[in-house]
Amino acid sequence: MKKVFTLLTVMGLSTAVFADADWNYTQPEQWSTLNQKYSACNGLNQSPINIERTVKAELEPLKFSYNTMIHTIENKGHTVQVDFAQGGELQLDGETFVLKQFHLHSPSENLIKGKSYPLEIHFVHANTQGELAVVAMMFAQGTENPMLKRMWNRLPKKQGEKVVLKTPQPVNEMLPKNLDYYRFSGSLTTPPCSEGVRWLILKEIQQASATQISEFSKLMGHPNNRPVQSLNGRVVLE
């Protein structure tokens, strides 16, 4: 398995993953042929996946210390993203993973029991070795989400545009009360598709209104989800 990351790579993750102009979502199956740097996109441990069969395990409780605020939202072209110079923390596998950024996909990239959701958020964390842990949270269409309402009062319309929130928002308020999760080993879902990522998919489904979902979809102008990838013998724990 390709263990990808140096800390320098992670610190520049927001641009390394989303700003390259030589890939898009029209033919994601060809990503591995576009650039030698993207060869991992044809790997055996790729994300996203369909979580269908799982193995029961005594997974450790997720311990978040998100004591940071959301100040700026940036349009990256392929997503909308919030970066953190000094993020909160996730304790996992006896290590500390620092929150670097979160971004959105619509529709969802990962499926749960074959079901797609209209919105998925990825919280990207890194440890001191530059290894990544991504916490994913799904949104179903339903009632208006108060946190998204405060964040999306004015979304950045153009690629590269940043919007500064008039009132910074606490990122910990985005987390659900129930932190039960699925776990598997995977990759980045965009080029360079680097593997060795610890994926944690929260089971509790959040809600967002049809208008909130539509606002993000219209902003992107296209679906920004990679198709599900083969498990290739990987096990999903819960």
Regions found by a protein language model. Name each.
Residues 2-10:
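Sec-dependent signal peptide recognition
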Residues 14-16:
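N-terminal signal peptide c-region/cleavage motif recognized by signal peptidases
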Residues 18-238:
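Alpha-carbonic anhydrase
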Residues 1-2, 225:
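Generic cytosolic/nucleocytoplasmic N-terminal low-complexity/intrinsically disordered segments
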